[in-house]
Amino acid sequence: MSGIGPDQALSIAAIATAVAPGQGGIAVIRLSGPSAVRAVAAITVIPGQQVWESHRVLYGHVVAAGGVERLDEVLVLVMLAPRSFTGEDVVEIHCHGGVIAVQQVLARVLEQPGVRRALPGEFSQRAVLNGRLDLTRAEAIGDLVGARSQRAAQLAMAGLDGGIQKKMVVLRERLLDQLSELEARVDFEEDLPPLNGEALLQELQAVRLELLTLVADGERGSVVRHGLRVALVGRPNVGKSSLLNLLSRRERAIVTDLPGTTRDLLESEIVLDGVPITLLDTAGIRATSNAVEKLGIARSRDALASADLVLLLFDLAQGWSDDDQALFALIPEGVPCLRVGNKADLPLKAEPVAETVAASVADVRLSAVTGDGEQALVQAVLERCGALGEQPLLLALNQRQSDLAVTAAEALARSEQVAADGLPWDFWTIDLRQAIRSLGEITGEQLTESVLDRIFSRFCIGK
């Protein structure tokens, strides 16, 4: 896909680095478009005989209107079309970090004719429109920026390196080969040897199965990319806060022997085997007249409803109680739950019957104090949430890509049914064309600008 949209006659500008008040040694202001070089040249004083050539770094100052007052000392990096990220003239102004100087420089840039503030993701969108990136690579940039774990970053890099695009091109070409065979038979059947319908059908089935495998991997990748919300639930003083501290490796919760110490919803961000996890340590749910504790319990119920997984802790030493069963009944239908028997290091105090019930109920046994059973819990969490698989996860489609892959697979299934029904060749081609179109949409070969606008609106400004 390439071409210039009506708004690409204007240059765009934005701060391309995250700037926090008083922080950051260097900030980068990026411009792209036909006016980029002229706009920066108009607001800078570049001493000596420095030449505005592509892929050169110039030293100078950004000056206020009037050309006298210096606003900042800067480096200017020039990248002329087509050898730039967007395929247009790109200029970066590297100025001092912070807030005031950066905003002053950006304001001067935006004062120049033909320059406007960039929309979220617009630099990447122009790269796609100008044929510098396919859509899967552009989306991978957003995934890399937002990666919350090393594993998520690795999956993003696989997409940025073209893994998804190359896979889709190969699958699409295989379908195009079959379509050309079918269409040739429709138009020139009497001049060609008989078509091997069985071989063609096997090829369609093979592509469909590959697409479904990619969709399944995409579901695993979604867990890695977006993470999980895991709620820790249990009676007061069963060890929820101790487990939170064990998994997060720091004292996030107040741990005492006083039941009901946690009265608020505590959150801890951790990474388990490459999967970002938000642990929600809830207040113990019980009947109470304390107004503060009631608020914490209400938040606990909300956490149950929003969680991807619930860890229901109970005291192995005390056994599975009626209160534990009542808590189990509060977990919303459809929310996965692991019943975790804690305090496995303590001597049993329960009656033999309660002890037997506890042993049979527990999905995982551990001691949050000693750490015994921690790895078994981690594996159980990842398995229950679909983050584990038989094969290593090398590529992961995002939701948009997965939806289109499903559409393509469904179209191929219909094509296979048409073949099974013995209908003529031209009926085979209808759904086959739909599958080919869907794969083209994944890489951006067949997309409207309105769809691109929606995709890139999720990006941060400056990317």
From Swiss-Prot:
Claim: Hydrolase is one of the keywords in the record: yes
Matching Pfam families: MMR_HSR1, MnmE_helical, TrmE_N
Location of this chain's protein in the cell: Cytoplasm
Residues given in the record as (6S)-5-formyl-5,6,7,8-tetrahydrofolate binding sites: R30, E92, R132, K463
InterPro entries according to UniProt: G_TrmE (IPR031168), GTP-bd (IPR006073), GTP-bd_TrmE_N (IPR018948), GTPase_MnmE (IPR004520), MnmE_dom2 (IPR027368), MnmE_helical (IPR025867), P-loop_NTPase (IPR027417), Small_GTP-bd (IPR005225)
Residues annotated to bind K(+): N237, T256, L258, T261
Function: Exhibits a very high intrinsic GTPase hydrolysis rate. Involved in the addition of a carboxymethylaminomethyl (cmnm) group at the wobble position (U34) of certain tRNAs, forming tRNA-cmnm(5)s(2)U34.
Record protein name field: tRNA modification GTPase MnmE
Biological source species: Synechococcus sp. (strain CC9311)
Gene name of this polypeptide: mnmE
